[in-house]
Amino acid sequence: MKIQKNAVNVLERTSAYLRAGLLTKQPAWYNVVASVPPLKKFERVPKLTNPSNDRINGQLHSLDSSAGNNGMFKTRYTAKDRSNASKQLYSASKLTYIEDQLREIFYKQHPWELSRPKILIENNGDEKYDWSHMQQIGKPLDGESVVQRTLYLMKNKEAPSLVLAYDMARYEFYRLRMQQHIEEQVAQEEAEMFGSVFGPSAIEYGIQKEQKVIDTWKRKAIIQTEIMAARRINPSESWATDEKDPKKNDDIEEDVEEIKL
């Protein structure tokens, strides 16, 4: 099948039309396409190695000396094995970074750090921080501070291994976080001393709402338990009591309305 290249040559054809006078006005996309021209290399180049870890792509796995589930030994590669290996040469390599591994470890060990509020600020990505110390101006203390501090210690060879560098950054993070908690607690106590009144926090408010639902459920459960016990003792009287005393049913309906509100 012949490769179609008309769309790729749109810049050259448009330039020729402008010079010949066929187009009197330059298109709005002309300068953009001229600064970033489309790729004209259509052949598929095999990716022999993964750039992130220098692992060889398309390499067949070694044959296992142990028997499989069916009790048979595999002594040679099948056509499917060779096909899967060749596909890896032309597929995009999965890039891995040490920063992602450090983030995964940190937030797995400290899941409550993810519950802290985040400020999403649109920036250009050119922010420069001095990671010779963890506390930064204009950046809150979080897990990313531990990651960047660990990389700084490794890059400047202040730690012999990645594990020790991570531990050093983590302990420094603990000290700063405890200092931050003490400062917030002292500031709150000083404000209360001068008459400030603080309402419930988000967690306390959620617990209060949850407790209301639990209390409502408890009252309904007690009423239903009494009804079931009465029916087991004397079924005929229990049905008559329910018809004569609608107060319990009204209480249940009020509880349901409270939950809906």
Swiss-Prot record:
Composition bias type Basic and acidic residues, residue spans: 241-250
Transmembrane spans: none
InterPro entries: Ribosomal_mS23_fun (IPR016939)
Biased composition (Acidic residues): 251-261
Presence of the UniProt keyword Ribosomal protein in the record: yes
Record's GO cellular component terms: mitochondrial small ribosomal subunit
Keywords recorded for this protein, A-Z: Mitochondrion, Ribonucleoprotein, Ribosomal protein
Molecular functions per Gene Ontology: structural constituent of ribosome
Pfam families: MRP-S25 (PF13741)
Cell compartment(s), UniProt: Mitochondrion
Chain segments carrying region Disordered: 234-261
Similarity annotation: Belongs to the mitochondrion-specific ribosomal protein mS23 family.
Subunit field text: Component of the mitochondrial small ribosomal subunit.
Identification of the protein by name: Small ribosomal subunit protein mS23
Phylogenetic placement of the source organism: Eukaryota, Fungi, Dikarya, Ascomycota, Saccharomycotina
